[in-house]
Amino acid sequence: MTGSISGEADLRHWLIDYLVTNIGCTPDEVDPDLSLADLGVSSRDAVVLSGELSELLGRTVSPIDFWEHPTINALAAYLAAPEPSPDSDAAVKRGARNSLDEPIAVVGMGCRFPGGISCPEALWDFLCERRSSISQVPPQRWQPFEGGPPEVAAALARTTRWGSFLPDIDAFDAEFFEISPSEADKMDPQQRLLLEVAWEALEHAGIPPGTLRRSATGVFAGACLSEYGAMASADLSQVDGWSNSGGAMSIIANRLSYFLDLRGPSVAVDTACSSSLVAIHLACQSLRTQDCHLAIAAGVNLLLSPAVFRGFDQVGALSPTGQCRAFDATADGFVRGEGAGVVVLKRLTDAQRDGDRVLAVICGSAVTQDGRSNGLMAPNPAAQMAVLRAAYTNAGMQPSEVDYVEAHGTGTLLGDPIEARALGTVLGRGRPEDSPLLIGSVKTNLGHTEAAAGIAGFIKTVLAVQHGQIPPNQHFETANPHIPFTDLRMKVVDTQTEWPATGHPRRAGVSSFGFGGTNAHVVIEQGQEVRPAPGQGLSPAVSTLVVAGKTMQRVSATAGMLADWMEGPGADVALADVAHTLNHHRSRQPKFGTVVARDRTQAIAGLRALAAGQHAPGVVNPAEGSPGPGTVFVYSGRGSQWAGMGRQLLADEPAFAAAVAELEPVFVEQAGFSLHDVLANGEELVGIEQIQLGLIGMQLALTELWCSYGVQPDLVIGHSMGEVAAAVVAGALTPAEGLRVTATRSRLMAPLSGQGGMALLELDAPTTEALIADFPQVTLGIYNSPRQTVIAGPTEQIDELITRVRARDRFASRVNIEVAPHNPAMDALQPAMRSELADLTPRTPTIGIISTTYADLHTQPVFDAEHWATNMRNPVHFQQAIASAGSGADGAYHTFIEISAHPLLTQAIIDTLHSAQPGARYTSLGTLQRDTDDVVTFRTNLNKAHTIHPPHTPHPPEPHPPIPTTPWQHTRHWITTKYPAGSVGSAPRAGTLLGQHTTVATVSASPPSHLWQARLAPDAKPYQGGHRFHQVEVVPASVVLHTILSAATELGYSALSEVRFEQPIFADRPRLIQVVADNRAISLASSPAAGTPSDRWTRHVTAQLSSSPSDSASSLNEHHRANGQPPERAHRDLIPDLAELLAMRGIDGLPFSWTVASWTQHSSNLTVAIDLPEALPEGSTGPLLDAAVHLAALSDVADSRLYVPASIEQISLGDVVTGPRSSVTLNRTAHDDDGITVDVTVAAHGEVPSLSMRSLRYRALDFGLDVGRAQPPASTGPVEAYCDATNFVHTIDWQPQTVPDATHPGAEQVTHPGPVAIIGDDGAALCETLEGAGYQPAVMSDGVSQARYVVYVADSDPAGADETDVDFAVRICTEITGLVRTLAERDADKPAALWILTRGVHESVAPSALRQSFLWGLAGVIAAEHPELWGGLVDLAINDDLGEFGPALAELLAKPSKSILVRRDGVVLAPALAPVRGEPARKSLQCRPDAAYLITGGLGALGLLMADWLADRGAHRLVLTGRTPLPPRRDWQLDTLDTELRRRIDAIRALEMRGVTVEAVAADVGCREDVQALLAARDRDGAAPIRGIIHAAGITNDQLVTSMTGDAVRQVMWPKIGGSQVLHDAFPPGSVDFFYLTASAAGIFGIPGQGSYAAANSYLDALARARRQQGCHTMSLDWVAWRGLGLAADAQLVSEELARMGSRDITPSEAFTAWEFVDGYDVAQAVVVPMPAPAGADGSGANAYLLPARNWSVMAATEVRSELEQGLRRIIAAELRVPEKELDTDRPFAELGLNSLMAMAIRREAEQFVGIELSATMLFNHPTVKSLASYLAKRVAPHDVSQDNQISALSSSAGSVLDSLFDRIESAPPEAERSV
């Protein structure tokens, strides 16, 4: 080392500085753990750098060294290490490393075993607690094999089901390992498991996995089964490009090497059960031969198929009792198990050099083979003894020196005695009788984990050696009589045993034998504990915890996990040690947060805040991006001082203390007092001289502190007197000169103390200048920010101005300052300032500086006496300086750090920057903060300054403690399997799902199992009726119950207990049904009968077989006596409409025939008499069960929620009912928010009960399909789109219309145009131009009846001054409906086409356009009701000349369009639904606490929900109007109130209990006088102003167009059109914060029977557009039905029609979610409807996101970029199978698992989307969404286009979404007329 480079840390800093200077990085971008290549060092750069290092270090440095040590940290460590001489000890040790018997250190371990074991510590606790992980096979594990023929099912039933199973083997963190979901699905879960556990093992070892890149690290992985690959390849149609690598055994090791970029050996080892111990042996050999420098040895085993179970069963190897009893007399075989284990190995000398924790030392190992024994799978005693002798010879120790052996110990009749004799013969011989060899086997706890068995035993043994204790061998009670333990000098450890004291290190052996004959044994020894050198273990006073993760969510998860651990198991670990491991022994990740703390309590609180994403002292949350290059140090003026500042820094920050000490002599000389003493003693600075000198001293010391952490200024700016410190830092002045300037300035100003003042005003500069115009002695002293200025002048005038500003409701306050600079009072001081500093000789700054002294920022100041005299007088142009720095021509700066003891300018800085450069990313930080721990505050700000990677913290001495490993974020990944349809099962029996019955004998003495199999088909249901739930057929619960009850009856049981319903059975497609009864348990499961992506078994119900028939009858009688009698005071009620009650809950139909004869209700009891038909082919049990289940769910008629059965504690069957009449008695025993519990008894009149259910529990569903548990209908598209309410919101997108060709079904060749009639406003000119195009004018005497084309030109003016918009709409509706009637009555051989022309409705700017807008809704209904006579509706511009439109109309007449058409500038536009996307334009709604909010229709069910919603958003005052008044409050308690009125009152009271003032007013919103009276009364009472409107009033009156009457139309339009117009006039744009109009999707989709309602809602849509254009936050919300409310009958009709496309109604919760979502966007009209993505040809919906190619050239550049980003995001997210909203546009595709196959698929879809041919390497050349969009933008629109041209064109193949909807709706039956 040279004088300037004294160690590794110095060399690291030198390398960072070199890269910053020569490669062009910023310090924040230089990650010392990234490879030099990743940091931009090319081969040429490496050659130059090697020469620089050779000269610096005085030794030869080769460029090759950069490849062997590829990171800054690794290179610094290598170059700083002493170079060994040939005869040095190091050389001797290096030679020793080549020895084949060098000890190997175990430095890290990881494991995952059943029983909740996820780490070595958990395994130790598990073993010491004598626990066992053995259980029966998980219910779904073998489901793919349960759908075979009966003989297969029988074999499966006879197969042992005992095992040790991991849960959730389908769970994997694919994103973390940068693997796409598609590839992860095809990966053997053993590969996935190994990736996670290996990462955990490396973290346990304290080795950041990222540091192993390109290193000679070997991977040796034991595995012996590839069942997943076999399953995945069984169906060739499912095999893809991932299948081979996903299922290959070799990839198990290679996958880890690939992900970590390891260059050592990568070997998959398969020697069956000895695989993992052989892997350890091979890893040790590879380390000793220097094939690798670090080795990862592993074993993994998963049991996915029953085939191997079956094979071992056949030879009697598996324990029928489900226990591994190694060495016990009752041993009857082993139990198979799952798990994974990983160990990290190093040569011992390397581990000691690196300060690693050495958990144990491998002294030797050996591997042999049985050769030819008594059979391939039979053990060979001689071979076992040979491997033991070889291992101990290799270890260099006597066999008698080993204390304990972890035996193979499977618990088999043959294997245990053979192994015991081999151990005793080799290792037991010569031992004293009282010191036997101790043996045990982990298989007694975990089962035989096969390929992972050796490493399981190895990890257990390492833990035992560490802890000095040996866990007990489970299930050892009586020694195996075939093993002479005493003679062999061996003992089985049957209790927790202390390690015997032997006088030598603890030593143990581990054995593992493969069933093919490969034997392995490893010898280990206790490792030596590493202790830090004396004096090196001092803990820092403040610690920084760096919590890293690939995403912000992962950072949060890690922080929460660490907090839990520090409060629990890690409570004794020192905070500094936690920081040590976290900061230096974890991999760097793209995102990180930091926590700075002095103690554990602060650290835990900070971690909790970081986990929650909250702000807290010391916490810096992950940055969303880098602010860009360039750092500015900003030096504030006076005011940041506080007593105690810097005291902690002096104690805890050496760089700060050194800076103060270096400054101290000159400071004392200039200031006359000690800066050190003031800071150390926490003294207060008093007087202008002390304050100004103390602050500059503080600023100079803080500057050195920042620089010591690598944060250097690129530019400096000083504010007022802060410019002195800035000049010193820039190099223009020395510290002594700076202190002299400050001392002179403060001394001259001191006599003026108290003679003037300054004030901070919340005003911009022009406003301030206007304010002080009348005060000539007051000046604008400081331009602080666009919103802040500071004035200076006489105190009295300053106070007067403060009063004036506060009167404007603006902030104004005096500045606490002794002397006010920057005003004319300074003029008298300037000469003295020039004189006293005349000899000042400043230098040229070495760092850029912007002076705030001059208005012209381009002034290059000379920091001499003249400058400082001017500085104290001139205004401070701080705002201008900051704006210039943030957007300068020489390059913008993005990080601004205020160097002061308290932040005064940070907010002003950020305000200025955001005003100057909106949308740019900047960071504005302080340094310290008043009255806080200044070390914690500084470190926190330091961390905020590092956004790319955290600041480097000193590396404490080793060892480091282990802390919890990375928390995974698992998602499910599994293959799909497919079986041929109809291969299994017969049709089910009538009334049940039971099919063919098979009895299956079991291996043990247990009773036989029973299996019923059937095939359920939609066209062959076992019940006569239907049971449709939201348009999907669901097998009723009664049939499911009847099924398992019938099976129980066949087995001699008449009762069931513990019935649990898990999933519904959807009967919309064929399904295979299995009922299995085994050992008093019964269950029903199903699987799709045909191969589909969801082809897996689903369990629907489980129960316990219970009680004998006699017991059951007794129970029934007792239960009937208790609950079967109706209460004495019961009264008979009217029989409710059962079908209506069910329909309200989304259920259509009954599966069985039964009717209600009487209904008697009292309190919680209900008795219902039911009648059954005389002929019941399926018997009476099914109908009775069906009645009981349905009626119990309806026991509270007033509760309209949907209830589904969840469980039954007991259900019993009695005698079969023979009569037609039975009674169902219901007793509701519990009723809460989650559901109800009911006891049910069914009996014929006066007879013994035939059915009893105790504690029938229903759960309430808020969402019809309960998609969290059940599959939605297949036609609904992706579940996410079906369930995420934010996906329900659409806008209307107007796109150029597709012109159909002559062969199009909707096109008609017009060779002989027929007569045309023009009706309505100004049709003469239009008629003339049509005549010129060949159309004949109709004879008007009978024109309409004879015309081929009828064109109605909408009137644009009212009939008179008093005609309101409602009157106008009624009049025009009457005219048009009469016209439709006339045309509809024409003969079929005289077709006609009706067209309507409107003007300006699209924009709705003019009143005449708004008035016509209702016609849009009416037009859609006419098209739906009368498609045979509908032509279309065309909207012209408001000023279009009808005569000029004639030729275009002539072309359109022959092309009927169900869509509304808009013609602008010669282009015809058609509507399409478009999802709402992009960034929100406003924050979520928050009501003002001092305002009131009006809801019309507010007393209805919908209005009251909206009132509650507003209350949730802070509304304190609500005005609810309705046409029906509420009774006086004194009558609110009366029992005579009806249910509906009671519901309204209860809702209002609930609001009032929340603190909301509710004013319920009876008013007709359509009546202008009523509304004016309401507002006038509020004004008189001084009520709070109304700041928001929700117009929810409305009624429906269903009529077909041909039946509509004027009165009916008026009734519907009055509240909608009339009410909205009254509200619009009463609350003009700008008077309210929001104006919401509750409309209906009927106005969009054209629902038969809804002409007037659709028309009224279209008016609301237009009014919203009109107000929005006037700057008012107005939105029309076009809803479908709200479930349970029936917003209107029309909305239900919309839902019924949309259900054919997979849509549905929505819950209130979903409605409000959608509302809140769309409210953030600048949208006038929102269509809220669940719309599935359109399915592809195969029904998969894979192409749902594709859009026709656009005409990019006519779009603005910003729009092109936005469209491309959104479209590409959809395409790529779909292919990568990640949620679109989680696809970061800046994240490289490679991190998401992109590969060439996926790239080709994305390329194809992108070509269709963009419309141009794309390169195959496109995604790799442009690896993020953002960069790809930028590239494509240049391809498709190379020239910037005006922002005004926003029209996008569709290709000729494009179709309108609405066209499709109308096509579906037009088939509505003509009898759609109905009443509400």
UniProtKB/Swiss-Prot annotation:
Ranges of residues in domain Carrier: 9-83, 1759-1836
Active site annotation, chain numbering: C273, H408, H448, S720, H1027, D1186
Pfam families reported in the protein's UniProt record: Acyl_transf_1, KAsynt_C_assoc, ketoacyl-synt, Ketoacyl-synt_C, KR, PKS_DH_N, PP-binding
Known pathway: Lipid metabolism; fatty acid biosynthesis
Positions carrying O-(pantetheine 4'-phosphoryl)serine: S43, S1796
Protein encoded by which gene: ppsA
Molecular function per GO: 3-oxoacyl-[acyl-carrier-protein] synthase activity; fatty acid synthase activity; oxidoreductase activity; phosphopantetheine binding
Co-factor remark: Binds 2 phosphopantetheines covalently.
Catalytic activity, EC: 2.3.1.292
Compositional bias segments (type: Low complexity): 1106-1115
GO cellular component, as recorded: polyketide synthase complex
Start and end residues of each stretch annotated as N-terminal hotdog fold: 997-1112
The protein's name in its UniProt record: Phenolphthiocerol/phthiocerol polyketide synthase subunit A
Region (C-terminal hotdog fold): 1130-1267
Domain PKS/mFAS DH: 997-1267
Protein role: Part of the PpsABCDE complex involved in the biosynthesis of the lipid core common to phthiocerols and phenolphthiocerols by successive additions of malonyl-CoA or methylmalonyl-CoA extender units. PpsA can accept as substrate the activated forms of either icosanoyl (C20), docosanoyl (C22) or lignoceroyl (C24) groups from FadD26, or a (4-hydroxyphenyl)-C17 or (4-hydroxyphenyl)-C19 fatty acyl from FadD29. PpsA initiates the biosynthesis and extends its substrate using a malonyl-CoA extender unit. The PpsB and PpsC proteins add the second and third malonyl-CoA extender units.
Residue ranges constituting the Ketosynthase family 3 (KS3) domain according to the UniProt record: 101-526
Disruption phenotype: Disruption of the pps gene cluster abolishes the production of both phthiocerol and phenolphthiocerol derivatives.
Residue ranges of the region described as Acyltransferase: 624-950
UniProt keyword annotation of Lipid metabolism present: yes
Residue ranges, annotated region (Disordered): 1104-1130
Enzyme type, top EC level: transferase
Start and end residues of each stretch annotated as Beta-ketoacyl reductase: 1491-1728
CDD domains, A to Z: KR_FAS_SDR_x (cd05274), PKS (cd00833)
Reactions catalysed, as given in the entry: icosanoyl-[(phenol)carboxyphthiodiolenone synthase] + 2 (S)-methylmalonyl-CoA + 3 malonyl-CoA + 5 NADPH + 10 H(+) = C32-carboxyphthiodiolenone-[(phenol)carboxyphthiodiolenone synthase] + 5 CO2 + 5 NADP(+) + 5 CoA + 2 H2O; docosanoyl-[(phenol)carboxyphthiodiolenone synthase] + 2 (S)-methylmalonyl-CoA + 3 malonyl-CoA + 5 NADPH + 10 H(+) = C34-carboxyphthiodiolenone-[(phenol)carboxyphthiodiolenone synthase] + 5 CO2 + 5 NADP(+) + 5 CoA + 2 H2O; 17-(4-hydroxyphenyl)heptadecanoyl-[(phenol)carboxyphthiodiolenone synthase] + 2 (S)-methylmalonyl-CoA + 3 malonyl-CoA + 5 NADPH + 10 H(+) = C35-(phenol)carboxyphthiodiolenone-[(phenol)carboxyphthiodiolenone synthase] + 5 CO2 + 5 NADP(+) + 5 CoA + 2 H2O; 19-(4-hydroxyphenyl)nonadecanoyl-[(phenol)carboxyphthiodiolenone synthase] + 2 (S)-methylmalonyl-CoA + 3 malonyl-CoA + 5 NADPH + 10 H(+) = C37-(phenol)carboxyphthiodiolenone-[(phenol)carboxyphthiodiolenone synthase] + 5 CO2 + 5 NADP(+) + 5 CoA + 2 H2O
Species of provenance: Mycobacterium bovis (strain ATCC BAA-935 / AF2122/97)
Superkingdom of the source species: Bacteria
UniProt KW keywords: Fatty acid metabolism, Lipid metabolism, Multifunctional enzyme, NADP, Oxidoreductase, Phosphopantetheine, Phosphoprotein, Repeat, Transferase
